[in-house]
């Protein structure tokens, strides 16, 4: 998903940065508000950030100019809401660009938009729909994390297709090519991420039940069954 340094045209890089900035700013406000109200949530916020950093650093080669990896943003979206994940993802992506050479500074806005905005908002929406449909809690967690991951890569494929449309088939043909290559690695990774998120949520429900109660997570103290 990390689009590498200098790969996008300048106007695209600027456009994605402008689109991402207000969401990240609102996310900072959201986090500050939540922490002021419940200071004990700092630990869970750190867990969500660490989960995102570790999973998204596990990359493998994929589409030219990008790579495949889990995103780890579904957990934070479920716990704190999608807007709070935007600044977390932004910091994670910035550190990875500077320290691990994953992604880049010029493509930071595009990477934030896909991994730290679209993915978390998709995960949160899927989780709410699953709970409204009375799916088991664990199924909701699994679907949220997995589909949030997949929609992150659909967004990246769209970004690349916009930047590099096919000479004959245009955007649609280019999107099909990018998405097809991503699918080979990302579908198994998304399933794995969903299962791992269920395991982590089980651990949080077991050892941090009190803190989770303040987040209005509807696990009701029960372990998640995937």
Swiss-Prot record:
* Gene Ontology BP annotations: cobalamin biosynthetic process
The record's section on Pfam families has: CbiM (PF01891)
Q: Where are the transmembrane segments?
A: 6-26, 43-63, 75-95, 107-127, 135-155, 181-201
Pathway(s): Cofactor biosynthesis; adenosylcobalamin biosynthesis
* GO cellular component labels: ATP-binding cassette (ABC) transporter complex
Q: What subcellular locations does the record give?
A: Cell inner membrane
Q: What's an example of a GO molecular-function annotation for this chain?
A: cobalt ion transmembrane transporter activity
- Print the keywords alphabetically: Cell inner membrane, Cell membrane, Cobalamin biosynthesis, Cobalt, Cobalt transport, Ion transport, Membrane, Transmembrane, Transmembrane helix, Transport
State the annotated membrane topology for this chain: Multi-pass membrane protein
Q: Which PANTHER family match?
A: COBALT TRANSPORT PROTEIN CBIM, PTHR43627
Q: Which family does it belong to?
A: Belongs to the CbiM family.
Quaternary data: Forms an energy-coupling factor (ECF) transporter complex composed of an ATP-binding protein (A component, CbiO), a transmembrane protein (T component, CbiQ) and 2 possible substrate-capture proteins (S components, CbiM and CbiN) of unknown stoichimetry.
State its role.
Part of the energy-coupling factor (ECF) transporter complex CbiMNOQ involved in cobalt import.
Designated name of the protein: Cobalt transport protein CbiM 2
Q: What is the lineage of its organism?
A: Bacteria, Pseudomonadati, Thermodesulfobacteriota, Desulfuromonadia, Desulfuromonadales
